[in-house]
């Protein structure tokens, strides 16, 4: 595969401010008519975080599930983008309602639909909040750059064995739309499973977030992902967007960290002299989310 163009942004936020924002998001969604039960993973996270703060637990305390907190912080960081995006909110009411299912940790999910929808909506929200014109239609959404419209089929991949299957389905969706498009895919679950670690890191330096999982990510891109991309070549599939989101606990400041990574990769047959190739290389520079002030 062609060398990817990167977008990466890492942010952190104190636990009390994060909790306040999480409560505000849930209240806003409930007021808008969404059903969010006390047993929902987002509600459970709020209870766990409140308990953590009130009881003065420390990072590494064995009586507290830090992995659950870290995963919840990633869920809320992604939900924040979805809530902020008017385009996504207006067009995806049924899909947004479905993301409130699922378990606190992805490894405990028996069904993946909730987090699958979460990734699709989160990616669409990123483009919308970055100033792109976004339409929520098949395959998953469209965006426009320099008056050129691209389609996106977004797939969350839960195992290496499913990479080819998910790419094949995405290709069919793009072909059905008839619009040049990207196969976008989340490798969060695969990367962390291969690391054989909890889905977070503890650090005092936000810069280390960028390096977490990068070796495994690039190995996947050069092997299993490259093989699946080659097998699913099509004139309408002009590129791929690899996504990796990393939650962290910043021990010294007792805060949550969050690193959002998107890698834009031109397809094999795209000429380096073409407008499409230039667009793919420029797109990471146009992504503006997450923004700390929001």
Task: Identify the function of each model-found stretch.
Residues 7-8, 133, 146, 151, ...:
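Compositionally biased, intrinsically disordered low-complexity regions enriched in proline and serine
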Residues 1-112, 116-129, 164-294:
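Charged, structured surface patches that assemble and position nucleic-acid processing machinery
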Residues 134, 157, 190:
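Short, solvent-exposed loop/turn segments at secondary-structure junctions
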Residues 127, 141-143, 147-160:
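Conserved catalytic cores of phosphodiester-cleaving nucleases, focusing on short active-site segments
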Residues 130-142:
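Short, well-structured beta-strand/strand-turn elements
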């Amino acid at each position: 595969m062609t060398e990817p163009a990167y977008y990466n942004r890492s942010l952190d936020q104190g636990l009390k401010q994060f909790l306040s924002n999480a409560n505000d998001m849930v209240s806003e969604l409930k007021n808008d008519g969404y059903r969010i039960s006390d047993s929902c993973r987002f509600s459970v996270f709020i209870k766990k975080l409140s308990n953590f703060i009130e009881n003065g637990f420390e990072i590494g305390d064995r009586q507290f599930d830090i992995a659950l907190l870290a995963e919840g912080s990633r869920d809320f960081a992604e939900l924040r983008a979805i809530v902020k995006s008017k385009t996504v909110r207006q067009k995806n009411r049924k899909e947004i309602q479905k993301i409130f299912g699922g378990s606190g940790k992805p490894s405990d999910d028996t069904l993946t639909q909730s987090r699958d929808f979460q990734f699709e909506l989160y990616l669409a929200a990123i483009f919308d909040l970055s100033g792109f014109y976004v339409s929520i239609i098949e395959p998953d959404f469209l965006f426009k750059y320099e008056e050129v419209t691209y389609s996106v089929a977004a797939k969350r991949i839960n195992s290496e064995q499913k990479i080819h299957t998910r790419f094949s389905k995405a290709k069919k969706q793009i072909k059905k739309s008839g619009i040049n498009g990207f196969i976008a895919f989340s490798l969060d679950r695969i990367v962390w499973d291969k690391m054989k670690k909890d889905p977070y890191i503890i650090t005092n330096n936000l810069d280390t977030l960028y390096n977490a999982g990068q070796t495994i990510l690039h190995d996947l891109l050069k092997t299993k992902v490259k093989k699946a991309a080659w097998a699913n070549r099509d004139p309408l599939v002009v590129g791929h967007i690899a996504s990796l989101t990393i939650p962290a606990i910043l021990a010294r400041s007792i805060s949550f960290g969050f690193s959002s990574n998107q890698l834009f990769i031109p397809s094999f047959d795209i000429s380096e002299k073409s407008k499409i190739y230039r667009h793919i290389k420029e797109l990471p520079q146009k992504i503006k989310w997450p923004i700390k002030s929001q």
